[in-house]
A protein has these predicted regions:
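FMN-binding flavodoxin-like domain, especially the glycine-rich phosphate-binding loop
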Residues: 1-20, 24-43, 49-190
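Ferredoxin-like iron-sulfur electron-transfer modules
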Residues: 168-172, 183-207, 212-224
């Protein structure tokens, strides 16, 4: 196959998925001597636009894991706005050191339905977005070395491909996809984490509006 571009495409609430996807994409691009283009769809305004690829593209496509699955807020964008055009794709998920459950197979299936060809896939541990204790310091240097090795293998694999594969790469997970994981307390009782809300320390807020601008849910009203 003759590839002309590598894409780094991601949803990244705290930056860990971004750094992982960009690292993998740049290693692949370096091995294949190709340029890299980046699409960050973390904010809602970007998710309103179509994103088109073609058969000369290799796309490293990543998202964080929420409750063992692809975040449900992303599903309309992923299913309706991504136009695969026969591109090769590498689904990547980042999870906060519990489990990625069905997130990887779910992302793979969605991207395949969009007209992309999954040739490899990976799940990596990242520091949990709710805590600096869960998955603390991840991805660490050992994780990054695995990312580099993963990317180098992908470069070798796609260089040898005569054409896009008909079947998507096998990945761990159940299909049909299971329901979203339900968090539980130490006694095993279900917890509703939707009640968790951020609290602003008004004495430290200068009203710059940055958090409202970069909020991946678009849920912060700067006028509040």
């Amino acid at each position: 196959m003759e590839l002309k571009k590598v894409w780094a495409v991601y949803f990244s609430g705290t930056g860990t998925t971004r750094s992982t996807v960009e690292r993998i994409a740049h290693v692949i691009a370096g091995k294949l001597d190709l340029p890299v283009e980046r699409v960050d769809f973390s904010v809602p305004t970007v998710r309103q636009r179509e994103q088109r690829f073609n058969a000369a593209d290799l796309v490293v496509f990543g998202t964080q894991v929420i409750a063992g699955r692809v975040p449900n807020v992303l599903l309309p964008y992923l299913r309706e706005k991504i136009i695969g055009g026969g591109a090769l794709v590498v689904p990547v998920v980042l999870f906060g050191n519990r489990n990625y459950d069905d997130a990887l197979v779910e992302l793979r299936n969605i991207l395949a339905a969009d007209g992309l060809h999954p040739v490899a896939a990976g799940a990596f541990v990242g520091e949990h977005s709710f805590s600096r204790v869960l998955g603390q310091g991840r991805p660490n240097e050992a994780d990054k070395a695995l990312m580099d090795e993963f990317a180098a293998k992908i470069a070798r694999q796609v260089r040898a491909l005569p054409a896009a594969p008909e079947k998507p790469v096998p990945v761990r997970g159940e299909d049909p996809i299971r329901p979203y994981y339900t968090p539980r307390d130490s006694a095993g009782n279900p917890i509703n984490i939707l009640k968790v809300k951020p609290r602003t320390e008004m004495t430290r807020c200068d009203g710059c509006g940055l958090f409202a601008e970069i909020c991946d849910m678009g849920s912060i009203n700067p006028a509040d």
